[in-house]
Swiss-Prot record:
Site (Increases nucleophilicity of active site Cys): 430
Name of this chain's protein: Cobyrinate a,c-diamide synthase
Reaction(s) the record says it catalyses: cob(II)yrinate + 2 L-glutamine + 2 ATP + 2 H2O = cob(II)yrinate a,c diamide + 2 L-glutamate + 2 ADP + 2 phosphate + 2 H(+)
The enzyme's E.C. designation: 6.3.5.11
GO biological process, one term: cobalamin biosynthetic process
Originating gene: cbiA
CDD domains: CobB_N, GATase1_CobB
Catalytic residues as annotated in Swiss-Prot or TrEMBL: 332
Enzyme class: ligase
ATP-binding listed as a keyword: yes
Listed cofactors: Mg(2+)
Record's function text: Catalyzes the ATP-dependent amidation of the two carboxylate groups at positions a and c of cobyrinate, using either L-glutamine or ammonia as the nitrogen source.
């Protein structure tokens, strides 16, 4: 089995662009992303033509992470890390960080750092990352934003002399490779201007300056192997009892430019449970397809508020399905769409579906008070789901507060998070089904 993780010393260090480059030069790549992000997997899929899967111990459990990683492995698995290598939910080393995932799965780590404003000191940085947790196999480094091959040679000599870690190459500074940031991290792949041109430049830089044969050797020789007959590639026992429970049922999923944030494992799990999946566009279609359940995921409805607001036929179709008693699950952007309206930053309000009695007020700042991983408890204060919140909006004009589920943070903070009126479940949390099977049973 060939696999490696590309992890950074911090956010903004260039691991996403270098991950994209490496995914473009290897054949039949299985891409993965540590953490709950939806944006980077979209880039992975654009580049490789294969689905990208999230690896998140908090939301999926250890068995869920193992299952997804082994099940979806192709010729070579490339895992893109999140934030800095050791950054996670707390300051422990078992904190759902990139290092934690790499150690748990037994994959080597290639560390990305930049070469700006340093020379020999770069070795101290690598040594610190190597020594903090010796159980993490840091097998090589790639240096980003290097001014010249001569400068790289200085870095390489210092790192290999003082740390014993191999230098695998470098990427030169190039302003043409900049990709603007938005919300969760990066623009969606379809929105990046001249993305193919940027990738072509990046691919050429990688082919010139990075030792791909050595990376493939590391991926092949230093990854823990597994037996295909092991239970590791079977669904986790805690969700396997739901297999085929919903055979004959149809779930309609919103999928278009406004709604695209779904975990691939969630969609496949719906099929595993027996659902037939149908897709529809709240932007362009006039009605929801014939179904038993409606699922509206996250995205950027605020960017398409006028178009969504003008599609009254779709509003009527969703309301009709609700009145017929069909269950509706809406996450973040989907929840915003079901509200009474979206108020843009400049003050204009666009009418939405009107099933959730509130208005969503867009802001230009991330709502830090509601940011990050959460447990979701029911009215009896029993955990039934795990997810995360990340939104640039707040609620206003809540006419009737029907929130019946509570978000619980690790530091003890709580808040009501999911509106539940009859057969409607709508709120900001993004939920991973592997850690939310009790919630799934209630909703589905």
């Amino acid at each position: 089995m060939k696999a490696f993780m590309l992890a950074g010393v911090s956010s903004g260090i260039g691991k996403t662009t270098i991950s994209m480059a490496l995914m473009s030069v290897f054949n039949n790549v299985s891409p993965f992303k540590v953490g709950p992000d939806y944006i980077d997997p979209g880039f992975h899929e654009f580049i490789t033509g294969n689905k990208s899967y999230n690896l998140d111990i908090f939301m999926m459990g250890e068995q869920g992470v193992k299952y997804s990683f082994y099940k979806h492995h192709k010729d070579i698995s490339i895992i893109e890390g999140v934030m800095g290598l050791y950054d996670g939910m707390d300051n422990s080393l078992d904190n759902n960080s990139s290092a934690h995932i790499a150690r748990f799965l037994g994959v080597p780590v290639i560390l990305v750092l930049d070469g700006v404003g340093k020379s020999t000191s770069i070795a101290a940085q690598v040594l610190g990352y190597k020594m903090l947790d010796p159980r993490v196999n840091i097998s090589g480094v790639i240096i980003n934003k290097v001014s010249s091959a001569k400068t790289y040679a200085i870095f390489k000599e210092a790192i290999e002399k003082y740390t014993g870690v191999k230098c695998l190459g470098f990427v030169e500074k190039n302003d043409k490779l900049n990709i603007s940031s938005q919300h969760l991290g990066l623009l969606q792949a379809s929105e990046v201007e001249d993305l193919r041109e940027k990738l072509s430049i990046l691919k050429n830089l990688v082919l010139q300056n990075i030792d791909l044969k050595e990376i493939e050797k590391i991926a092949s020789e230093q990854t823990r192997t597994f037996n295909e007959n092991e239970t590791e590639i079977e669904p986790p026992l805690y969700i396997s009892y739901l297999k085929d429970r919903y055979v004959g049922k149809i779930i309609a999923i919103a999928q278009d430019r406004a709604f695209s944030f779904y975990y691939n494992d969630n969609i496949e799990f719906l099929e595993y449970m027996g659902f037939k999946v149908k897709y529809f566009s709240p932007l362009k279609d006039s009605k929801v397809p014939e179904c038993d359940i409606i699922y509206l995921g996250g995205g950027y409805p605020e960017n398409f508020a006028e178009e969504l607001s003008n599609n009254k036929e779709m509003f009527n179709s969703i309301r009709k399905n609700y009145e017929q008693g069909k269950n509706i699950l809406a996450e973040c952007g989907g929840f915003m769409y079901l509200s009474n309206g979206i108020e843009q930053i400049e003050g204009k309000v666009y009418q939405m579906c009107g099933l959730v009695p509130c208005v969503v007020n867009m802001t230009n700042r991330l709502d830090i008070s509601r940011f990050g991983y959460i447990l979701i408890n029911n009215k009896n204060d029993i955990e039934i789901a795990r997810g995360h919140e990340f939104h640039y909006s707040k609620l206003k004009a809540v006419l009737e507060d029907t929130r019946k589920f509570k978000a619980v943070k690790k530091d003890g903070r709580t808040w009501e998070c999911i509106f539940n009126e009859k057969n409607l479940y709508a709120g900001y949390p993004h939920i991973h089904f592997f850690g939310s099977y009790k919630f799934i049973e209630e909703v589905f």
